[in-house]
């Protein structure tokens, strides 16, 4: 009998369940201006977080960090399925999209709120997930700028690369 034929299978871990939900929630989504499946980003963020901690709640939050902001999944559903701590970390990574205004008009406001929140936070879990998320984003931008150059910036709500540089420097300072 091989491992696939075993009668009793262990219950999926918290992290396994987070991967399943994130994959379902992000199904069919792609990274901005790319053919890369979106799930690659939260999986990379979780892999980065795993270099800093083996805490299953932090790793679950890392893989789930965009589901509330970008999909149909609600924070209450995260809380019910994964508990308060995971939900609180995911909430800390979720921007208020301000659906009543164009995203380009609220970019600076949203990013400043993120920087302010990270500056005030004393929760190491929040900082680990934020760092993992931002590092994954920076890596993707680096790969893409090597491929398409400054055309990269056209895909974002904020078209000015200097503003992106400000944001990631400010996040870095907030995480110190």
PLM segments and residue spans:
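Active-site helical microenvironments for divalent-metal-assisted chemistry
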Residues: 2-176
